[in-house]
Structure formats: structure tokens, C-alpha cells
Amino acid sequence: MKFELDTTDGRARRGRLIFDRGTVETPAFMPVGTYGTVKGMTPEEVRATGADILLGNTFHLWLRPGEEIMRKHGDLHDFMNWQRPILTDSGGFQVFSLGDIRKITEEGVHFRSPINGEKIFLDPEKSMQIQDALGSDVVMIFDECTPYPATEDEARKSMQMSLRWARRSRDEFDRLENPNSLFGIIQGGVYEDLRDESLKGLVDIGFDGYAVGGLAVGEPKADMHRILEHICPQIPADKPRYLMGVGKPEDLVEGVRRGVDMFDCVMPTRNARNGHLFTSEGVIKIRNARHRDDTSPLDTKCDCYTCKNYSRAYLYHLDRCNEILGARLNTIHNLRYYQMLMEGLRGAIETGTLDAFVADFYTSQGREVPELVN
């Protein structure tokens, strides 16, 4: 992978990630394909929304279908018929989400399979081996996602163990002679000094990119913004910056304003299945009865397949009848909305008009522009 930085506007960055399988324009949003599919979508449909890269889930793909089946197909690209770049998370966040049914030790994590209750052990080395089998273009280190709330001492111990796991991840990645890219993950909770220590340790090890983890886990939005404003300028400028698991459209805007290059989140797809649709004027809840006889499209400013062909009344009808097509059309729209937002942000950075773009974004939704802390 090669990262090119073209231009900046304030702290926002316009660039691209160049892989053998294709180029990803940044800032970029990555749709989430947990089980090797963006729910309800064919790869061609996802690509048509403007997506250059997908995120796959190491933990779930390890449990089902498993490494052996993946290797028989070649890798995840061949298995799911997506021949463009794929980033896979390490499984650390999914293990964190298991709560009481997992035990974290220095060696790794012991837990019971949420599928059949089988005892399973996952450590940095195994995570690297799974992602090698997946053929991930971007591999994420295995880390512990620091919970919120956490005391500074708890956050420090978690962050320092993640640093030790980062070293083990790097060593195993190198031992496997994996030709792809490996990203480190900055932890430390809401504590700036711990974030500093984490980043320094990761830079000393050396990675192809740096992710900010452990945000959007329940902390106040102001803390997320504060940590991003503090840590992003310290990340080496020639490396991509990835904000994991974020988020709402306004979170993407605020992340870009603070120098983030990459995002992922299940929100556009999950919300689509629940009838929450993002538009240029805010969220539409298609299940509301007022859409029953509305012949207008979801968003007159959207060029997606759904908006060009179907009315709000039709989408309301599909939702009320629990038709699968409704969820699919909603998903196409939400994914395209996110990609159009990223296209707009990239264009604004290129032309030095990001402030105006951000102001228009919030004005159209009847909201004030959040201030940058620094």
C-alpha cells in the first residue's frame, strides 16, 4: 500500500490509498461486511454506491466459515467476489463486546463461541494468521478495546497490554511474510497522556497506518472530539489515519475536520434495515404514517438507484409489509448517501472550501456547527 497526500484544508486531508487491487480516495468511508457480505447487497451493488474498499470481520469469519474454507477459495476477495481492497479488523472489539463470557490474560483472550459454546482462545498470533488467510489488504493488530468508563489506571494497564500485543502482532505478521499492510491501533481511553504513550510505542514498532480505537464506546461526543484534536496532528503525516467504528454523518464530518482519513461503521446499513434513512435534510423515519401517500423520492439531491426509481410511499409500503426489497432499497440509499458525503468532503478540501461545506451541511439539518477545541 502507498499513501499519497494531495492537499489539506485546515487539518483536513485529501489523498488516496493505492493498493494492487485498486485506489481508495480519501477521506474514505468503508461499508461493513461482517460475514463477507454487506447485508442484503451484492458486491456490484455496493460498488455502485461508490465504495472503493470494504471492511470484513476477522472474528466472525474465523468462527464461520473458518480459515480452511477461506484458503480453499483463495482468500476473502475470491470467497465473496469483491476484487477491490478489503480491511479486516483483528477481532479485538468483538471479544471486548462479549462481556462476561470472555477472560482476558496477557497471553490472549479465552471465551466461549457465541455460536455453539465451544471454548476458544484468540491471541495476537492467531489473529495475524486468520487475517493472512483472509488475504486482507489492510490487517489490524490485535488489541484490547479500552472500555468506557475506565479509570486512568485501568486505561493505562489496558493500553500497555495492547502495546505488547502490538509488538507480537508485528512479529507474527513479519514471520508470515505477509505482503500486505499492517495498521497499529492507538488506545488510552479519554486520557491524552495515555494516547500519547500509545502512539509513541506504536511508532517505535512501526506500522503502515495508525487507527484511533476505543472511541464511540459510550464517551461524550466532546471527549471524542478532544482526543481526535489532540492525537491526529501527532500521527506521522505520511501515514493514513483511521477512526474505527465511527459513525453518524456528523461524526464523519467532524473526524475529517480533525484530520481523519478513513472511517467504518454499521450505521448506514443497520439503520436502513430499521427504516432510518439519511438525507441531505436530516433523518427520515420511513415507518412514519405521513409517508404513506408521499410520491416524492427520499432525497431530491441523491442520485442512488432507490431515489431515482421509487417513492417514499413505496418504501413505506415495503416496510409495512416486511418485504426484503425494502431493506435492500433502504441500504442502497444509505450507503450512497455516505459515499456522496465523502465525495463532497473530498471536493471541498480540494477547493479550500471545507468551512463552507461544513456550514451548509449543518444548516441544511437545522443545526449549529460544532467548534473546534483548538
UniProtKB/Swiss-Prot annotation:
It comes from the Bacteria. Residues 245-251, 269-273 are annotated as: RNA binding. HAMAP family: Q_tRNA_Tgt. Catalyzes the base-exchange of a guanine (G) residue with the queuine precursor 7-aminomethyl-7-deazaguanine (PreQ1) at position 34 (anticodon wobble position) in tRNAs with GU(N) anticodons (tRNA-Asp, -Asn, -His and -Tyr). Catalysis occurs through a double-displacement mechanism. The nucleophile active site attacks the C1' of nucleotide 34 to detach the guanine base from the RNA, forming a covalent enzyme-RNA intermediate. The proton acceptor active site deprotonates the incoming PreQ1, allowing a nucleophilic attack on the C1' of the ribose to form the product. The gene is tgt. Pathway: tRNA modification; tRNA-queuosine biosynthesis. This is Queuine tRNA-ribosyltransferase. Its cofactor is Zn(2+). The active site is at D89 (proton acceptor), D264 (nucleophile).
